[in-house]
Every structure is written in C-alpha cells, then in structure tokens.
C-alpha cells in the first residue's frame, strides 16, 4: 500500500497569552454562553450605561460610590477588567472620603478605551 504525502497547510497558532485588549473576549463568550447576538446586545447596553454613569460621576453626586460599584459589576460581566479595577479604585476612594479626581480620571480613560473597542466590535460584527 503506497504512502501518499499530502501537503498540510500551516495555520498560525492562537497566541499563548490572551489578548491584552480592553475586553476579555473569552470571558464575554463564557458569560453569554457563546451567543454572538447576546454578546453584541450586552456590549451595546454596557456602552450606553457606562456613558450615562460617567456623565453622572462628572457631577460628583452623593451616590457616586454606588454608581462606581454598579459600573464595576457591569464591567466585570463583559470582561472589561481595567474598567472594573478603576471603578473599584474610585469606589473605595470615595467611601474613604478622600479626593477621587485621579481615580475618576483613570476610570474615564478606561471607559473611553472600552467604548472604542465596543464600537469596533459592533461595526465589524
């Protein structure tokens, strides 16, 4: 029985380390049970919610720590861990009654980065 050689087309392997993007796509897929439509819906909801929360936080309302806590939970659900960390920093800063300007700026930057990533994901999907 002759042995036939077959050309195997090489495909690059996925990276060993996860992408360092602002959204952990594997986490998002787990949270949405692999449902691409649901993932898009959740991302769109987060984009809207985060914009509203950031607008509110810029006015330093009395419930700012609670708003930061809410944003932290939402960010964790979609895999936006930098936003979650920044929201946690702001929340703990506000609850300790110390100046939160630096933490708020970090959160604003993290949210802006995630919203850009969400826009790109929604446009390409």
State each model region's role.
Residues 21-70, 77, 100-122:
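Long, amphipathic alpha-helical coiled-coil segments characteristic
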Residues 68, 75, 87-90, 94:
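Hydrophobic helical segment of the DHp/HisKA dimerization and phosphotransfer domain
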């Amino acid at each position: 029985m002759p042995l036939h050689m077959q050309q195997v087309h090489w495909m690059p392997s996925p990276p060993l380390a996860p992408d360092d993007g602002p959204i952990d796509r594997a986490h998002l897929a787990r949270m949405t049970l692999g449902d691409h439509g649901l993932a898009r819906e959740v991302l769109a909801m987060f984009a809207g919610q985060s914009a509203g929360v950031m607008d509110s936080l810029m006015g330093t309302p009395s419930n700012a720590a609670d708003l930061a806590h809410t944003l932290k939970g939402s960010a964790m659900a979609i895999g936006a861990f930098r936003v979650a960390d920044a929201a946690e920093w702001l929340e703990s800063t506000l609850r300790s009654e110390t100046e939160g300007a630096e933490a708020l700026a970090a959160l604003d930057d993290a949210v802006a980065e995630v919203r850009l990533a969400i826009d790109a994901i929604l446009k390409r999907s």
